[in-house]
């Protein structure tokens, strides 16, 4: 440890020099809320104003209320269902230029930028979203709670409670997860093999069903390797609320038809 700053009015002590470089070492992210990014529409995010963010030790920015859309993608022109996206703030290193926001599928840094001039500040999952009211109760097309046809009132979009930031996120990797409440995050999809003896929540994968000779303990062990745990019954009921029951004669709501001869894929 050593003293980083001193009060020296003569400015002869280098430790009294307060510049962008030094400020970047002591300013991480200062935000009015841990949830400084949120889903403000099916295909848009909002970065709240008043955040102070350091990028690469050479740039510090104060955010304005900013809307991000697919136009901020580093590649492509639309979000894809089942994908996890990362939000970056980037610094062109031009003093007169403001920050630039880039959304990318890359988990390290966006295309066209690098680790020194970009910083990951959050992310989200783009998937299937059920129509709900402010209390998260399912609605049908006419906005009636559990009204006729509510089961099919689903559309593609940014999963609102999947949006995470550096101050609001699970302890494990946040991909394929949503916020349940009370500090708890849960997986969106049935767990599948992550290839590293753990489990993951990912769209379009073959789920682990128990037919792989895995028992309860195996699931506990493999989830622990991924930094997760099994939900308790109350948590399961909370995040399963609003999911329609599977049908015996169709796979409309889930892979549940009695005529199925094998397992499907997640999503």
Region annotations inferred by a language model:
Residues 134, 140-157, 162-267:
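Short aromatic-cysteine micro-motif
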